[in-house]
């Protein structure tokens, strides 16, 4: 599949750097610099999210993460760029809004829904996911970390 990005995403293909290891002559080592894809949605985050974000028939997204989740941070930025609503279900308490990750997520327009640890454990529970789908029928649910 192509790694072509949507027009709203300022995507730069990751370069491949050759690395020399003087102690091991003849060894060829190459590093794919996915960290350079984008300053916020980089590396494996882009690879995991690009297919979810290209779905045409969704009106919003729901996903899960902790108070310092790189996944939610990247997803919130991408949703903001696409003008797509995001409901971020976050394990923790509202006082965590003091951290830069959640401040960015909030500034990019995501609705942050704080849940306790017991509620957060339900994020893979079939009945819980069905209740979210019933409540938000036009939203796509993305697992924690974008692992779908």
Language model features: what each stretch is:
Residues 1-148:
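PLP-dependent amino-acid enzyme catalytic core
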